């Protein structure tokens, strides 16, 4: 755990209130239960468009559970139920009649551990496109190239698209998973500790990529690494025991937290 606050490289300035900006997503009074375990307790958060929001907090605080709730991934877990609203484009997607396939197309997700398909590099990106009905080979190839370029991977793999994705390094596999997600042209990307299993060089590439991707997508990232949150995010939400303790601009939260629990956590006094 850090013993000092993460350094903020920019001059402290007031970040616009997230509620004053156009919202890509929001939750209102969101609760998540695993059986009798009340994992998320009435969370209200708003995620501004084309910004990066980091979710931080100690292990077991609920941040990954909350992230998975945003595109209904928790529906795959037996005994899990959710109450409250998950608003995407102003529509509550926490309803039984919602098409989850389309939800996850619009709200893409990249997991902590790279999980490429046991297919070629090309097929990893093209698979979802074909499944959604794209048939023109030229159009598919154009989308594959565009997605790999956006994931800063094209120059490294353009001559090896037929090779197995499993032959790539861990960092390359994670960028391939990001390319696979952006190929579906989502509006929101959910990143669950995308660099935690990577070496420092690969981590740096992922962070640079996040800063590029926010020009096209709204990004919500879970991270245990507070230095990383400080480097890549515009807004930060501190979770503790399934609740949001504080949510503000990243520079404000790390340099002038308003809650003692936040101050204690970023100073390394607990968590």
Curated annotation (Swiss-Prot):
Catalytic activity, reaction form: phosphate(out) + ATP + H2O = ADP + 2 phosphate(in) + H(+)
Secretion signal, residue range per the UniProt entry: none
Domain of life: Bacteria
Keywords (A to Z) from UniProt: ATP-binding, Cell membrane, Membrane, Nucleotide-binding, Phosphate transport, Translocase, Transport
Domain called ABC transporter: residue spans: 25-266
Principal cellular location given in the protein's record: membrane
Function of the molecule: Part of the ABC transporter complex PstSACB involved in phosphate import. Responsible for energy coupling to the transport system.
BP GO terms, sorted: phosphate ion transmembrane transport
Name by which UniProt lists this protein: Phosphate import ATP-binding protein PstB 2
Electron transport listed as a keyword: no
Membrane topology: Peripheral membrane protein
Family named by the database record: Belongs to the ABC transporter superfamily. Phosphate importer (TC 3.A.1.7) family.
UniProt GO MF annotations: ATP binding; ATP hydrolysis activity; ATPase-coupled phosphate ion transmembrane transporter activity
UniProt GO cellular component terms: plasma membrane
Region (Disordered): 1-20
InterPro entries, alphabetized: AAA+_ATPase, ABC_transporter-like_ATP-bd, ABC_transporter-like_CS, P-loop_NTPase, PstB-like
Subunit structure: The complex is composed of two ATP-binding proteins (PstB), two transmembrane proteins (PstC and PstA) and a solute-binding protein (PstS).
Compartments where located: Cell membrane
